[in-house]
Amino acid sequence: MQENPISNSLSKTDSNEASNPIRSLMPFRYGPLCYAIVDVEIGLTDHRIHDIGALRYDGAIFHKASKEELLPFLERVEYLCGHNIIHHDAKYLFEDRQIPWRLVDTLYLSPLLFPERPYHRLVKDDKLLSDQMNNPVNDCEKARDLLLDEMARWDAWPEQKRRLFTALLRDQPEVDGFLDLMGAGLKNCDLREQIATVYRGRICQNVELEPLIEHYPCELAYALALIDTTDHRSITPGWVLHNYPSVEFIIKKLRYTPCLAGCTYCNSQLDVHRSLKSLFGYNAFRTYEGEPLQERAAQAAVEGRSLLAIFPTGGGK
């Protein structure tokens, strides 16, 4: 049987790797895998296909402008991968035709698997950083390298976290193909309990998770991915917020809405006195004629109330 170049990115490189245009992705533990990576160049004014590049699992390369000739090249392929393939490349390549492949989109995976600043070296906003302009084969190579890193990062996650994100993202078309590629089976789990356990101390313990799980599973996944970061300058990419505007609302619910009962997270992270000490080094807020104006303004801000704070001279602006 011919060796399949898609594999585990952690495995050792074999002697044939240098001659294979598709770098070994790791002996794939879920069995033989037939895949291709595709990229399409579209004209800015005529919105027509100007060039197509594709890399196949057996090392074959396709570089033509004919989508009709691409189809025989993909004949034995099971997984069709690319960067923004679902809502861009596939739309131009196959139009309304039924797609027989499982689509794996590296774009939607990147903010989930690499949410930490400085993010992934191959991605800027929603674009791949390419070495060559208007070369779809080169873009396929970059998409392949990004996919490799995404596979390795997924494998490096703790099993409980993988189970949690699988439960949230199964049946989401932008991610489902990747989960299938990684053999991520859906197991019975109490998602609310899983999230509360994995993110204990990093989100409000009393937040109502059930409505978020039911109505915003994808947005919740992006929010949790950002919460996992340790660099406070890490942000959700603008294109994610454009496609999933509820991400900001969910982060506010999880992290910036103090619960009435009080919990470990809210009592420590949303306490204005603790923050005053940790951020500014002061033990107490300044008062003005006995009135704690600073404290009231800070508390109103933490509670998300609309406010306009006007301090008199000497009042602690």
Regions flagged by a language model, labelled:
Residues M1-L33, D105:
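N-terminal accessory regions of nucleic-acid-interacting proteins
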Residues F28-P32, P72-E78, V302-E303:
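Flexible, charged surface loops at secondary-structure boundaries
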Residues L33-G43:
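Two-metal-ion RNase H-like nuclease active-site motif
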Residues Y35, E78-L80, R305-A309:
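Generic beta-sheet signal
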Residues L44-D51:
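Short, flexible loop/turn motifs enriched in small residues
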Residues G53-L129, M133-W154:
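Conserved DEDDh/DEDDy metal-dependent 3′-5′ exonuclease domain
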Residues W157-F165:
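Short, glycine/acidic-rich hinge or "gate" loops at secondary-structure transitions
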Residues L164-K317:
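N-terminal helicase ATP-binding lobe
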